[in-house]
């Protein structure tokens, strides 16, 4: 299954869970926890085979949920939109080691993406390691990840 398809399934599941949460839906921290856990599980599933892969899913889900909850607690929709657009631009065009920053003028939250090593994975996809730093209400959170291009260029 393509990564994009998996992400769409996760996003759909998250929105359905929000709808079940009653009027007003889930708060930002709950959404961040849910999406972080799902994203972490997806990332963890890319490593190992058999039981090792299950461990990767579990560890990825746990770490993603914790980090997602912390970040989601303070980020609003504009923060998320700015971070997403900046991430895409940084991973596609920025030189390794450079910081590409976003800043929300309405609340002072900001962050930056630092793309690092570019490589080809075992299936031939071009991938890039990155560091994402987010400062919400003066508190810094840092996450590390890998992003890979799909065969269709996404």
From Swiss-Prot:
Q: Name one Pfam family in it.
A: 17kDa_Anti_2
Compartments, as annotated in UniProt: Cell outer membrane
Query: Which sites carry lipid of kind N-palmitoyl cysteine?
Result: 20
Keywords (A to Z) from UniProt: Cell outer membrane, Lipoprotein, Membrane, Palmitate, Signal
| Cystine bridges | none
Classify the protein's membrane topology as the record does.
Answer: Lipid-anchor
Lipidated sites in chain (S-diacylglycerol cysteine) = 20
Protein's gene: omp
Which top-level group of life is the source organism from? Bacteria
Signal peptide residues are: 1-19
- Cellular component GO terms, alphabetical: cell outer membrane
Q: What is this protein called?
A: 17 kDa surface antigen
Query: Which species expresses this protein natively?
Result: Rickettsia rhipicephali
Q: Which PROSITE patterns match?
A: PROKAR_LIPOPROTEIN (PS51257)
Read off the InterPro entries from this record: Anti_2, Gly_zipper_2TM_dom, Surface_antigen_Rickettsia
Family that this chain belongs to: Belongs to the rickettsiale 17 kDa surface antigen family.
């Amino acid at each position: 299954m393509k990564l994009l398809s998996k992400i769409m399934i996760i996003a759909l599941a998250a929105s359905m869970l929000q709808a079940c949460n009653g009027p007003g839906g889930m708060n930002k921290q709950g959404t961040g926890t849910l999406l972080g856990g799902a994203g972490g599980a997806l990332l963890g599933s890319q490593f190992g085979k058999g039981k090792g892969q299950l461990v990767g899913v579990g560890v990825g889900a746990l770490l993603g949920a914790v980090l997602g909850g912390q970040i989601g607690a303070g980020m609003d929709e504009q923060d998320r939109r700015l971070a997403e657009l900046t991430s895409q631009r940084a991973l596609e065009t920025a030189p390794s080691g450079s910081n590409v920053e976003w800043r929300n003028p309405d609340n002072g939250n900001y962050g930056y993406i630092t793309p690092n090593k570019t490589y080809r994975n075992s299936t031939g996809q071009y991938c890039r390691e990155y560091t994402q730093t987010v400062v919400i209400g003066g508190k810094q959170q840092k996450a590390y990840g890998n992003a890979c291009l799909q065969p269709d260029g996404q």
